A protein has these predicted regions:
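Terminal low-complexity tails and localization/encapsulation signals of metabolic enzymes
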Residues: 1-36, 68-72
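Glycine-rich loop-to-alpha-helix module at the N-terminal edge of alpha/beta enzyme cores
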Residues: 29-97
Length: 97
């Protein structure tokens, strides 16, 4: 299973600006575990600009709503727990359990 990891900037998925990627291989089997966008300085700048633009809305979000959003994000991660474990095991050569 090969996982593709792109850049999530300003609410959308993107390739790296120059389309460069880096590949991680399973250390024991030499299979490709993941291919990730290799962010450039320009990509980093876009990330910083998007974060700065989003901050006022986050700053003004009430604590209870922030809590709800973060708990929702945690729930989405838990629903994909097996995929996270498989990806980390493949990239590091570790066992899943």
């Amino acid at each position: 299973m090969t996982i593709t990891c792109n850049l999530y900037i300003d609410g959308q998925w993107h390739d790296a600006e120059d389309r460069r990627t880096f590949t991680r291989r399973h250390p024991a089997q030499d299979d490709v575990a993941s291919v990730a966008a290799a962010a450039s300085l320009a990509d980093g700048k876009r990330c910083v600009e998007a974060a700065a633009s989003a901050f006022p809305q986050w700053r003004d979000t009430l604590p209870a709503e922030r809590r709800r959003l973060l708990l929702d994000a945690a729930e989405h991660m838990l629903l994909r727990e097996a995929k996270f474990i498989a990806a980390m095991a493949a990239e590091t050569g570790a066992t899943a359990h």
